[in-house]
Amino acid sequence: MAEQKKQLLIVTGMSGAGKTVAIKALEDMGYFVVDNLPPELLGSFWELINNSSDFSKAAVVVDLRVKSFYKDLVDEIKSLEDSQNVQSTVLFLDASDDVLVSRYKETRRLPPLAHTGRLLDGIQEERNILSRTKNISNIIIDTSHLSTKELKTKLVDKFGDNRTRTFSIEVMSFGFKYGIPIDADIVMDVRFLPNPFYIPQLKPFTGLDRRVFDYVMSKKETKEFYAKFLDMLETAIPGYIAEGKEKLTIAIGCTGGQHRSVSIARQLAVDLAKKYPVDISHREISRYIGQ
């Protein structure tokens, strides 16, 4: 079986066209990313990646420093094409002059070649230098009318894989007395629900026990709350997915994380799993099991 070629993505383009957004998006997709790599080191970088089993895909972001910089980049890219183990793609990010001027004014920064302080002169000089690189690029994305979210979506569509596009949910129960989970995206306080703690026959058990679960979920207050909570989540989750979120953590909390939060988390995981991949965890459960 032929050895699968490793992927090398070379990201370049106009300053202010979105390379910073591209870095973050590619890292989220599992790329090993190096920013501002000098072109003369491209071959050495690829040799390092190609000889390592830790990286299956890598990206380099090349920044304009001097006028000869991009001449070197094109030469290095062409030399890489002779390698039998490299599958390289050149991504060029572009934007119109007026959009770039507007972006620079918002950030109060100057293009790298705006030596006289004139924005448009610096942009036009950079565009002239980059023309050769743009001509050899495999993919050109004009970001003039793209939001950060839209650019990220385009990058995921072009360079992501099925794994990176998978959205998943973690449902966890916890006890407020032990602190709110710092990684939670949504925190729901269910301390207002009827508490099995005050039922002697149920107090020793947890929401993993059928008796406790049935007690919590059968209450009128629970039914009314849960129906609205589930409806809210089913409305909100598609929005999280549209924003590019890959994992949503929903934390359900009661006083000690023993009865109510565990019961609600169990039911929520079952219902959300009908549409999405769901993992469930009970942060405090070890405090009560085996007592």
Curated annotation (Swiss-Prot):
Signal peptide limits: none
GO function term, MF aspect, one: GTP binding
Family annotation (Gene3D superfamilies): P-loop containing nucleotide triphosphate hydrolases
UniProt binding sites for ATP: 13-20
UniProtKB keywords: ATP-binding, GTP-binding, Nucleotide-binding
Binding site for GTP: 63-66
Taxonomic superkingdom: Bacteria
Protein purpose: Displays ATPase and GTPase activities.
Family listed: Belongs to the RapZ-like family.
NCBIfam families, sorted: PRK05416.1 (NF003828)
Family annotation (PANTHER family): RNASE ADAPTER PROTEIN RAPZ
Designated name of the protein: Nucleotide-binding protein LJ_0866
